[in-house]
């Protein structure tokens, strides 16, 4: 029992360390990493905040469709802080990292991992483990919505496979179908 508790505390400490390091990385390193793609995400959020919408009919990307993407986080923040893009970017990335950690934990638990291992998975999912990961997930946040959706999809699929109650299975299946359509519309 004592060893199990120690393992849980160790996992919680590692998760907290990962979260603190990622938070510090986002807050302290913001200025060094802003590029035109990141700025365009904020320009879209500013545009949507002025329109009062989360999805724009007047802004189009040349290569993708955006339904469930970073604008769902950045736009409300831009409406709250329209003159502080740095704050919007930093808070938005922190919120997206929290969503990524939560979805990783859900996925791990749904796949049958013990709480401590799911917590480690959540911590590692928000850790800067390479330059590319930092650019695309941590700082850029471009693929965080896709990673969150994938974690949710895998977790729900695992729950569907283990759920025995017919009514719950139908509910999970309906969620998976809706999530599939949203993922398809969010290329």
Predicted segments with their positions:
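Membrane-interface junctions at the ends of membrane-embedded or membrane-associated helices
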Residues: 1-6, 110, 157-172
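Start-transfer (signal-anchor) and selected internal transmembrane alpha helices
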Residues: 1-22, 170
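Membrane-proximal lumenal/periplasmic loop motifs of glycosylation machinery
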Residues: 27-36, 50-75, 79, 86-87
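Extracytosolic (periplasmic/ER-lumenal) interhelical loops and adjacent juxtamembrane/interface segments
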Residues: 42-47
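Membrane-interface micro-motifs in multi-pass membrane enzymes
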Residues: 63, 67, 115-161, 186-187
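Membrane-helix interface segments
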Residues: 84-87, 112-119, 166-173
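Transmembrane-helix motifs of polytopic, lipid-linked glycan transferases
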Residues: 91-116, 152-155
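Membrane-interface alpha helices of multi-pass inner-membrane proteins
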Residues: 171-187
């Amino acid at each position: 029992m004592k060893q199990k508790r120690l393992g849980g505390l160790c996992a919680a400490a590692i998760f907290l360390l990962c979260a603190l390091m990622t938070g510090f990385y986002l807050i302290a390193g913001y200025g060094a990493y802003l590029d035109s793609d990141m700025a365009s995400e904020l320009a879209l959020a500013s545009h949507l905040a002025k329109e009062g919408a989360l999805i724009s009919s007047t802004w189009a990307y040349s290569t993708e469709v955006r339904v469930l993407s970073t604008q769902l986080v950045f736009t409300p923040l831009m409406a709250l802080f329209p003159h502080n893009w740095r704050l919007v970017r930093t808070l938005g990335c922190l919120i997206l990292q929290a969503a990524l950690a939560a979805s990783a934990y859900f996925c791990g638990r749904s796949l049958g991992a013990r709480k401590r291992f799911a917590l480690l998975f959540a911590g590692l999912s928000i850790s800067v483990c390479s330059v590319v990961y930092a650019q695309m997930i941590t700082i850029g946040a471009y693929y965080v919505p896709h990673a969150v959706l994938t974690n949710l999809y895998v977790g729900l699929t695992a729950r569907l496979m283990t759920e025995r109650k017919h009514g719950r299975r139908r509910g999970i299946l309906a969620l998976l179908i809706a999530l599939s359509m949203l993922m398809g519309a969010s290329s």
